[in-house]
A protein has these predicted regions:
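N-terminal amphipathic alpha-helix/helix-capping segment at the start of soluble metabolic enzymes
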Residues: 1-20, 39
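Conserved active-site and cofactor/substrate-binding residues in soluble primary-metabolism enzymes
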Residues: 3-4, 24-28, 57-64
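Alpha-helical scaffold segments in soluble metabolic enzymes
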Residues: 7, 11, 32, 65-68
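Short, contiguous strand/loop micro-motifs
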Residues: 20-21, 53
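Conserved, mostly hydrophobic/aromatic
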Residues: 23, 33
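A broad, structure-centric signal for solvent-exposed, well-ordered loop/edge residues
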Residues: 29-31, 53
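Active-site cofactor/substrate anionic-group-binding motifs, chiefly glycine-
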Residues: 39-76
Length: 76
């Protein structure tokens, strides 16, 4: 599920848990990170740096795919 990051972090702060931001450099990593979050029932932040995006993938291509994968996830 795709959620507002501020809301997710506010919930984590209020309830006393951390949210891991995972630096993902390709779609295989994004898929693995989201699958692991689903299996563990914990929210995550999929992180991609501007430098990585400029060298490894174009934002116009990868952002819609990441959003689609996040929307299908069972966890934020």
């Amino acid at each position: 599920m795709l959620v507002n990051m501020k809301d997710m972090l506010d919930n984590a702060s209020r309830d006393g848990y951390a949210v891991m931001a995972v630096n993902s450099v390709n779609m295989e990593m994004v898929r693995a990170v989201i699958e692991a979050a689903n299996e563990e029932h914990f929210p995550i932040i999929v992180q991609m740096g501007v430098g990585q995006m400029s060298k490894l993938a174009h934002a116009d291509d990868i952002v819609p795919m990441v959003i689609n994968m996040a929307e299908r996830a069972d966890v934020p």
